[in-house]
Amino acid sequence: MARSIKKGPFVDDHLMKKVLKAKESGDKKPIKTWSRRSTIVPEMIGLTINVHNGRQFVPVYITENHVGFKLGEFAPTRTFKGHKGSVQKKIGK
């Protein structure tokens, strides 16, 4: 179920404070956050946010196309190494 429009997008308060502070000062230093559940809002455009994926921080540069998505969608938590390949057996005649 989608979030109600009247509630607005969810952004953690501590993250929003850091974003507004970075926008005021024009600071381009990445913002480090563990808040994967926060929605990307237009105020974040042009900033780099380091999102924690459980092991390390993944840098995410925010563009207009990212608005409306969650930060966690751009920092995958699982590494897919592929399915086990079948071994071709040689058939001798």
UniProtKB/Swiss-Prot annotation:
GO terms for cellular component: cytoplasm; small ribosomal subunit. InterPro entries: Ribosomal_uS19, Ribosomal_uS19_bac-type, Ribosomal_uS19_CS, Ribosomal_uS19_SF. It comes from the Bacteria. GO terms for molecular function: rRNA binding; structural constituent of ribosome. Keywords: Ribonucleoprotein, Ribosomal protein, RNA-binding, rRNA-binding. It holds the Pfam family Ribosomal_S19. Belongs to the universal ribosomal protein uS19 family. This is Small ribosomal subunit protein uS19.
